[in-house]
From Swiss-Prot:
One of its GO terms (biological process) is sterol biosynthetic process. Pfam families: HMG-CoA_red. Coiled coil: none annotated. CDD domains: HMG-CoA_reductase_classI (cd00643). Residues 97-160 are annotated as: Linker. Pathway: Metabolic intermediate biosynthesis; (R)-mevalonate biosynthesis; (R)-mevalonate from acetyl-CoA: step 3/3. The chain crosses the membrane at residues 29-49, 73-93, 531-551. This is 3-hydroxy-3-methylglutaryl-coenzyme A reductase 1. It catalyses: (R)-mevalonate + 2 NADP(+) + CoA = (3S)-3-hydroxy-3-methylglutaryl-CoA + 2 NADPH + 2 H(+). GO terms for molecular function: hydroxymethylglutaryl-CoA reductase (NADPH) activity. Its EC number is 1.1.1.34. Residues 161-575 are annotated as: Catalytic.
Length: 575
């Protein structure tokens, strides 16, 4: 038996059985299929109604009192009442209940044959039908405090595993050493998971542990795993970019984000596609060194920025990797401290490790001529990694990309449900002036971070680098005598790679393969990562176009008034 297979089974309190009788339904009137039952009662209702009206007309003509009825008329009246009660019970009550339940789920009635779209400021776009809402009341057992002497889940299969769990709980075996001691990553994760539950008295029942290759993350992706988190992946597209179509995978838990981006992709596709240009490709790392005086720090600055010394430094730097190629060095002084920003190409890797190795080589080389140099840190935040910084916004980091498209007037009206003038005005006041009022740094856009983070998670990028990768300025202007819309996004610091890190995981590798950028491009090193950056920019272009159109169309207030999503979520949580 699989050792970890039983780890999912917790010891539960005996549930309270719901023995309440099933509520009878109108459709139970006849032991027939529902559509036949409905047909019978529809026919009965209209036929007896016609018969009674015909009989009463004859009585009026013959001056016969209406209250005098024959046996056939009595049967007809009873049949009319019975069929009316059935139809009211089947359609009337169910209609009212479904109408109430549907009040916060209906999609907008757009004049398009494609799925309707609903977008709000949080980029939630409703396309799915409402989930069935059960009105049946169930009794839930009150949570009981777990005894400290029993495990939260069924005991492990082998006595050896039980002993290891107890040793981890008692602190005799470090949790981080399980993989090396056991030689089985999956078994180590299961034992660590059980030990964690016993130590914290908290269940991890909803966190899956089976179905994951723990060997693939050992020593490179995650330490001390106890399971993995599931995130749904949706597909937006096709995105027509530079003459090619791409189906864009987006991993997100934000409802309607994928559908919103999909609508933008549709508008771009119907307008002839988008075009992207790579402006720069270079990862950076900036160590901080200190001298006894600012004069000495300035001497190193002049040495590093002297073009005559670049080739020598490049040879030293490039020894770190066959893909690393030093592009430039920029320095900044703060007192007697010197910040040195190295920039280099990194092939298809995102390149943080690669550039760090090159920087280390150069620092060791400089020690011969600047022995008084004190290396404070390999990173001095002049890089700047995983934080908003003007240096990335101005100089760029990773891939710098600009992507543009011209959206036709009829597409703006039919697909986006707005007009060019409104979009241009909104972009000026919201993305440009509004962001300036807010003191934004690289945030001159509507929601670039939404699309960037969703693609990053799906393709195995570093989610934390969404901070600088989402730096974007969205521009819109009317062209072709004001009929069409020119839209562009300029993103100076998209940090992506197609090898290394999370890109080698099975799910993320599959998403990269879907885009045609899996792994390294042996014929043209770096082309896969550059293409991925272009796809990210194109997807951001689609997302910006769709959300801005929804805002320009004035649908935000309508969506919040009609679809009270927060109230719906609260009611679910309360139930």
């Amino acid at each position: 038996m699989d050792t970890t297979g039983r780890l999912h089974h917790r010891k539960h309190a005996t549930p309270v059985e719901d023995r309440s009788p099933t509520t009878p339904k109108a459709s139970d009137a006849l032991p027939l299929p529902l559509y036949l039952t409905n047909a019978v009662f529809f026919t009965l209702f209209f036929s007896v109604a016609y018969y009674l009206l015909h009989r009463w007309r004859d009585k009026i003509r013959n001056s016969t009192p209406l209250h005098i009825v024959t046996l056939s008329e009595i049967v007809a009246i009873v049949s009319l009442i019975a069929s009316f009660i059935y139809l009211l019970g089947f359609f009337g009550i169910d209609f009212v209940q479904s109408f109430i339940a549907r009040a916060s789920h209906d999609v907008w009635d757009l004049e398009d044959t494609d799925p309707n779209y609903l977008i709000d400021e949080d980029h939630r776009l409703v396309t799915c039908p409402p989930a069935n809402i059960s009105t049946k009341t169930t009794i839930i057992a009150a949570p009981t405090k777990l005894p400290t002497s029993e495990p939260l889940i069924a005991p492990l299969v082998s006595e050896e595993d039980e002993m290891i769990v107890n040793s981890v709980v008692d602190g005799k075996i470090p949790s981080y050493s399980l993989e090396s001691k056991l030689g089985d990553c999956k078994r180590a994760a299961a034992i660590r998971r059980e030990a964690l539950q016993r130590m914290t008295r908290r269940s991890l029942e909803g966190l899956p542990v089976e179905g994951f290759d723990y060997e693939s993350i050992l020593g490179q992706c995650c330490e001390m795993p106890v399971g993995y988190v599931q995130i749904p992946v949706g597909i937006a597209g096709p995105l027509l970019l530079n003459g090619r179509e791409y189906s864009v995978p987006m991993a997100t838990t934000e409802g309607c984000l994928v559908a919103s981006t999909n609508r933008g992709c549709k508008a771009i596709y119907l307008s002839g596609g988008a075009t992207s240009v790579l402006l720069k490709d270079g990862m950076t790392r900036a160590p901080v060194v200190r001298f006894a005086s600012a004069t000495r720090a300035a001497e190193l600055k002049f040495f590093l920025e002297d073009p005559d010394n670049f080739d020598t430094l490049a040879v030293v730097f490039n020894k770190s990797s066959r893909f690393a190629r030093l592009q430039g060095i920029k320095c900044s002084i703060a007192g007697k401290n010197l910040y040195i920003r190295f920039s280099c190409s990194t092939g298809d890797a995102m390149g943080m490790n690669m550039v760090s190795k090159g920087v280390q080589n150069v620092l060791e080389f400089l020690q011969s001529d600047f022995s008084d140099m004190d290396v404070i840190g390999i990173s001095g935040n002049f890089c700047s990694d995983k934080k908003p910084a003007a240096v990335n916004w101005i100089e760029g980091r990773g891939k710098s990309v600009v992507c543009e498209a011209i959206i036709k007037e009829e597409v703006v009206k039919k697909v986006l449900k707005t007009n060019v003038a409104s979009l241009v005005e909104l972009n000026m006041l919201k993305n440009l002036a509004g962001s300036a009022v807010a003191g934004a740094l690289g945030g001159f856009n509507a929601h670039a971070g939404n699309i960037v983070s969703a693609i990053f998670i799906a393709t195995g990028q570093d989610p934390a680098q969404n901070v600088e990768s989402s730096h974007c300025i969205t521009m819109m202007e009317a062209v072709n005598d004001g009929k069409d819309l020119h839209i562009s996004v300029t993103m100076p610091s998209i940090e992506v790679g197609t090898v290394g890190g999370g890109t080698q995981l099975a799910s993320q590798s599959a998403c990269l393969n879907l885009l045609g950028v899996k792994g390294a491009n042996k014929e043209s090193p770096g082309s896969n990562s550059r293409l991925l950056a272009a796809i990210v920019a194109g997807s951001v272009l689609a997302g910006e176009l769709s959300l801005m159109s929804a805002i320009a169309a004035g649908q935000l207030v309508k969506s919040h008034m009609k679809y009270n999503r927060s109230s719906k979520d609260m009611s679910k949580a309360a139930s």
